[in-house]
């Protein structure tokens, strides 16, 4: 099974989006 650049980017996005949301939420709560 080959992994294409598109699949890698998709996996990165799926991994990053919850992290970014949690980071922004933490910043909001820290104010």
From Swiss-Prot:
Q: Which GO terms describe its cellular component?
A: chloroplast thylakoid membrane; photosystem I
**What residues form the membrane-spanning segments?**
7-26
Which cellular compartments is it found in? Plastid, Chloroplast thylakoid membrane
Name it: Photosystem I reaction center subunit XII
Record's signal peptide: none
The root-end lineage is: Eukaryota, Discoba, Euglenozoa, Euglenida, Spirocuta
Against Pfam families, the record matches this protein to:
PsaM
Question: What is the organism of origin for this protein?
Answer: Lepocinclis buetschlii
Q: What is its main location?
A: plastid
Task: Name the gene.
Answer: psaM
- What membrane topology was assigned to this protein in its record? Single-pass membrane protein
Domain of life of the organism in this record? Answer: Eukaryota
GO biological process assignments: photosynthesis
Alphabetically list the UniProt keywords.
Chloroplast, Membrane, Photosynthesis, Photosystem I, Plastid, Thylakoid, Transmembrane, Transmembrane helix
Q: What family does the Swiss-Prot or TrEMBL record give for this protein?
A: Belongs to the PsaM family.
Question: InterPro entries in the record, alphabetically?
Answer: PSI_PsaM, PSI_PsaM_sf
């Amino acid at each position: 099974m080959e992994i294409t650049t598109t699949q890698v980017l998709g996996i990165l996005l799926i991994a990053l989006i919850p992290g970014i949301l949690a980071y922004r939420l933490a910043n909001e709560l820290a104010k």
